[in-house]
């Protein structure tokens, strides 16, 4: 295959990977043109000779730390696909001052050590003095969205009624808000420094407006922490708080009773298991049954928010269409209906709640009873293994 053919194949592959197959006869209209890779190489091979200049060139730099691709065709193709994802993201974000690079774990081991790169096949994002490990889906759109968030300030200011309403509408992730005198306040600066530690995974908000603070029942230099899907906040004690106090509080409370699996942080969430297991709930929010089940989950979570042993991961299948067939096959479940079960993160063994009536969802009380059995160990994936062994013996 010559260079021109190879380039054509790479472009076609990227479009299929990122944008899907184009419909025959459908052309992009002005204002709705999806980006197509223009063939310009923007992703830099970062090494000992050029890494200092590369860091000086970009406000934000995303580096893929990778092991050398194997010689087989599948490994080579996989690496090309990953490189093409970075190329499209680099093209889209070129005017934003975002650069992209590759660091080979063998050829450039010395550079990797200097930069603190430790986990292969991970993307590390450098912004000023902060290093952020990207733990999300390896796709151009998700990566671009994440990096646009990185470019934003770590603290968003609430200055009026509309911004307050937008803040209150955020329910599916942890959020913090503090009330301070002004930007020069030493307590606001401590809050901002703490925000940088969690940016962009956890949103931090602040207000200098006494009217906004009154509606939020915030006192001066007070910080409220909202757990995901919880209506009432918890106030960080002993105001005014230092950066260390804020960071420690967030670290201690960041695992919500109910948390949503999101493309931009899916691996971080999945790796934060409870003794090797996850309680996983599948529910399509756009589906009537899924919405109803999600409301039941919220109610149960709100009633049990003080239980540190309970954490449920909610997955909306609509967010991960490529994973739906895998989940259905691996867990032997039908994701066209809501499901909740226990998953072993080591071997993907699972056991799922049986619904007495397929047309009726469990009540909050029934779900709480089931969760209590899970937490007490009466329902676990080992029991499922024992049943499989019994079936084998019968054979």
From Swiss-Prot:
It comes from Oryctolagus cuniculus (Rabbit). It holds the Pfam family Calsequestrin. Residues 1-28 form the signal peptide. It is a peripheral membrane protein. N-glycosylated. Calsequestrin is a high-capacity, moderate affinity, calcium-binding protein and thus acts as an internal calcium store in muscle. Calcium ions are bound by clusters of acidic residues at the protein surface, often at the interface between subunits. Can bind around 80 Ca(2+) ions. Regulates the release of lumenal Ca(2+) via the calcium release channel RYR1; this plays an important role in triggering muscle contraction. Negatively regulates store-operated Ca(2+) entry (SOCE) activity. This is Calsequestrin-1. The lineage of its organism: Eukaryota, Metazoa, Chordata, Craniata, Vertebrata. It is found in: Endoplasmic reticulum; Sarcoplasmic reticulum; Sarcoplasmic reticulum lumen; Mitochondrion matrix. InterPro entries: Calsequestrin, Calsequestrin_C, Calsequestrin_CS, Calsequestrin_middle_dom, Calsequestrin_N, Thioredoxin-like_sf. Belongs to the calsequestrin family. Residues 376-395 are annotated as: Disordered. Detected in skeletal muscle (at protein level). Detected in skeletal muscle. Monomer; increases in response to a depletion of intracellular calcium. Homodimer. Homotetramer and homopolymer. Can form linear homooligomers. Ca(2+) ions promote oligomerization. Interacts (via C-terminal end and preferentially with the monomeric form) with STIM1; this interaction increases in response to a depletion of intracellular calcium, decreases both STIM1 aggregation and clustering, interaction of STIM1 with ORAI1 and store-operated Ca(2+) entry (SOCE) activity. Interacts with ASPH and TRDN. Keywords: Calcium, Endoplasmic reticulum, Glycoprotein, Membrane, Metal-binding, Mitochondrion, Muscle protein, Phosphoprotein, Sarcoplasmic reticulum, Signal. The modification Phosphothreonine is found at residue 118. Glycans are attached at residue 344. The modification Phosphoserine is found at residues 75, 210. Its main location: endoplasmic reticulum. Gene3D superfamilies: Glutaredoxin. The modification Phosphotyrosine is found at residue 37. GO terms for cellular component: mitochondrial matrix; sarcoplasmic reticulum; sarcoplasmic reticulum lumen; sarcoplasmic reticulum membrane; Z disc. One of its GO terms (molecular function) is magnesium ion binding. GO terms for biological process: positive regulation of release of sequestered calcium ion into cytosol; positive regulation of store-operated calcium channel activity; protein polymerization; regulation of skeletal muscle contraction by regulation of release of sequestered calcium ion; regulation of store-operated calcium entry; sarcomere organization.
């Amino acid at each position: 295959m010559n260079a021109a053919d190879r380039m054509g194949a790479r472009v076609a592959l990227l479009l299929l990977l990122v944008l899907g197959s184009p419909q025959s006869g459908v052309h992009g209209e002005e204002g709705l043109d999806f980006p197509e890779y223009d063939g310009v190489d923007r992703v830099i091979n970062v090494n000992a000779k050029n890494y200092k200049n590369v860091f000086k060139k970009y406000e934000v730099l995303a580096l893929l730390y990778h092991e050398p691709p194997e010689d087989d065709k599948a490994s080579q193709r996989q690496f090309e696909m990953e490189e093409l994802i970075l190329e499209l993201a680099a093209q889209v974000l070129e005017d934003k001052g975002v650069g992209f690079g590759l660091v080979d774990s063998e050829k450039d081991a010395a550079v990797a050590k200097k930069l603190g790169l430790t986990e292969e096949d991970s993307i590390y994002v450098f912004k000023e003095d902060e290093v952020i490990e990207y733990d999300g889906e390896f796709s151009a759109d998700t990566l671009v969205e994440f990096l646009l968030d990185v470019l934003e300030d770590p603290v968003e200011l609430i200055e009026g009624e509309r911004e307050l309403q937008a803040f209150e509408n955020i329910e599916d992730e942890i959020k913090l808000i503090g009330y301070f005198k002004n930007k020069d306040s030493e307590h606001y600066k401590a809050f901002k420094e703490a925000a940088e530690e969690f940016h962009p995974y956890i949103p931090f908000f602040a207000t200098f407006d006494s009217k906004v603070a009154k509606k939020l029942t915030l006192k001066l230099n007070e910080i409220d922490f909202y757990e995901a899907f919880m209506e009432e906040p918890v106030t960080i004690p002993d105001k005014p708080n230092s950066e260390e106090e804020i960071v420690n509080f967030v670290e201690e409370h960041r695992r919500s009773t109910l948390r949503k699996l999101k493309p931009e942080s899916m691996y971080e969430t999945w790796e934060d298991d409870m003794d090797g297991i996850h309680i996983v709930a599948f529910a399509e929010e756009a589906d009537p049954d899924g919405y109803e089940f999600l409301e039941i989950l919220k109610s149960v979570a709100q009633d049990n928010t003080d239980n540190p042993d309970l954490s449920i991961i909610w997955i909306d299948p609509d967010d991960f269409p490529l994973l739906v067939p895998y989940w259905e096959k691996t867990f032997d479940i039908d994701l066209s209906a809501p499901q909740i079960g226990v998953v072993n993160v080591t071997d993907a063994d699972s056991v799922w709640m049986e619904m007495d009536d397929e047309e009726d969802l469990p009540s909050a009380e029934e779900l709480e009873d089931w969760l209590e059995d899970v937490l007490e160990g009466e329902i676990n994936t080992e029991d499922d293994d024992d049943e499989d062994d019994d079936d084998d013996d019968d054979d």
